[in-house]
Design a protein with these regions (language model features):
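Non-transmembrane, aqueous-exposed alpha-helical and coiled segments at domain scale
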Residues: 1-348, 374-432
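Acidic, glycine-centered low-complexity repeats within long intrinsically disordered regions
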Residues: 354-369
Length: 432
């Protein structure tokens, strides 16, 4: 069984949908696993010949090739929105997507979304740049003990679900709204007290949960597939624990953390991690963007058809890559995060096996800067390091150049720098 994680290297919008779809179309008997975030993803897939274009939110990018999607327990599906996406997909491709879900996947509710949007409005000029899809509020509600799972939606009656939602509203939502500064003047305040909103939500999600097949995802079930593709939302620089860009982050793990845990629970390991980036950097929403420029300052870069201006995300912003060191650093940091998993497991099991430490340092071929790879600790037989790839999309826009602060770098030069770090850089032209 081949296990692959597709991950955004920067702030998202790098081309993860394209990467997942290409893998799904070329690998036999594959399964796409959604493992972080929820309905806020927007992964665009275009036919290689330009005949069609579809934006995936919760349906895996690659489902158009009859590849099934699994919602892992770390994914937070928005079943209110899922019905619309499945309808659009079915009308577009002529068949329904195959959707599986782990039973304990946490469900995003309508009040999570309303609290999220209300909070962003209340923040005014200090918005976090949220997509307004309720992910942070889903996390907070579950942490407070008011969770609703996919299995709950299946087993409860409509009245059971409505009663549960009313309980959450009374015991949690009203208090949470005050904490977030959502008052009567807020346009979302009234809906947080409107019972019809809950009733409509119940009707919709009870119908849409029928689109999912609940499964016990053990190793035997996974072995029915030859290839596992972990489709990751957002990007490494938005990871919930990457404090350099706080509070403008997402409420999920955006790297190899979730796939590694998912696989190790079942006695498997992650074999490949593919980090996706454009030749330049993009970001939507509020928050820092180093080396930011206007799109017109990036030769050849055209308008992005997916990330159109909207109330929550604003306009898509552009930047040059800061330096080669900064280009590779997020990938190396994500790889080294496996050390934290090892240490936590070591504490959990009260074991103290031998630690093997290695330090790597290389000097780049294109600049005088020195890239120092952080110290790595690996234990034999645990958290095997995956092969690392950086997949560069949109190179046709930039004539095979990557845009950096101190000048453009040819793709071939980037490949050489990556090889010295144990990272293989590949271009989208190789996959078309």
């Amino acid at each position: 069984m081949r296990t692959i994680a597709v991950i955004g290297k920067n702030f998202g919008d790098e081309g993860k949908g394209f990467a997942c779809s290409r893998l799904a179309s070329s690998l036999k008997n594959a399964l796409i696993i959604k493992h972080n975030g929820g309905g806020q993803a927007g992964h665009t897939v275009e036919d290689p010949e330009g005949k069609w274009r579809f934006i995936h939110h919760q349906i895996g990018a690659g489902a158009e090739y009859h590849v099934p999607t699994l919602f892992a327990d770390s994914f937070m599906p928005d079943l209110f929105q899922l019905g619309k996406e499945v309808k659009e997909f079915t009308e577009f491709f002529g068949f329904k997507p195959i959707l599986y879900s782990e039973k304990n996947a946490r469900v995003t509710t309508v009040e999570d979304v309303l609290l999220n949007m209300g909070a962003e409005v209340a923040r005014g000029k200090n918005r976090h740049g949220s997509c307004g899809m309720g992910i942070e509020e889903c996390v907070q509600r579950n942490a407070a003990g008011y969770g609703i799972t996919v299995e709950g939606l299946v087993t409860w009656t409509k009245q059971d679900l409505l009663d549960r939602l009313k309980q959450i509203r009374k015991e949690y939502t009203e208090r949470r709204a005050k904490i977030l500064g959502i008052y009567p003047s807020n346009p979302y305040y009234e809906m947080l007290y409107n019972e019809t909103v809950l009733e409509n939500f119940v009707v919709e999600v009870k119908e849409n949960v029928k689109l999912l097949t609940l499964v016990d995802v053990d190793r035997k079930w996974l072995e029915e597939f030859q290839n596992l593709i972990f489709e990751t939302g957002q990007g490494l620089l938005l990871d919930q624990d990457y404090e350099a860009y706080a509070p403008h982050l997402t409420s999920s793990k955006t790297g190899i953390h979730n796939p590694t845990i998912f696989l190790e629970k079942r006695g498997l390991s992650l074999e490949e991690a593919i980090y996706v980036t454009r030749p330049y950097v993009t970001r939507h929403g509020n928050g820092p963007l180093p080396s930011e420029v206007k799109r017109s300052e990036l030769p050849g870069v055209g308008e992005d058809l997916t990330n159109q201006p909207n109330e929550w995300q604003g306009i898509l912003r552009y930047a040059r890559h800061k330096s080669l060191k900064d280009f590779f650093e997020p990938v190396l940091r994500d790889r080294d995060s496996l050390n934290d998993l090892d240490r936590k497991e070591q504490i959990k099991t009260k074991e103290s096996p031998e630690i093997i430490e290695t330090t790597d340092a290389v000097e780049t071929t294109e600049t005088t800067e020195h890239i120092v790879v952080t110290k790595r600790s690996t234990r034999p037989g645990f958290s095997k390091l995956p092969k690392l790839f950086i997949f560069i999309t949109q190179l046709s826009e930039t004539e095979n150049q990557l845009y950096f602060d101190k000048g453009n770098i040819p793709f071939e030069s980037l490949q050489k720098a990556g090889e010295e770090l144990g990272i293989q850089c590949i271009s989208d032209t190789e996959w078309r």
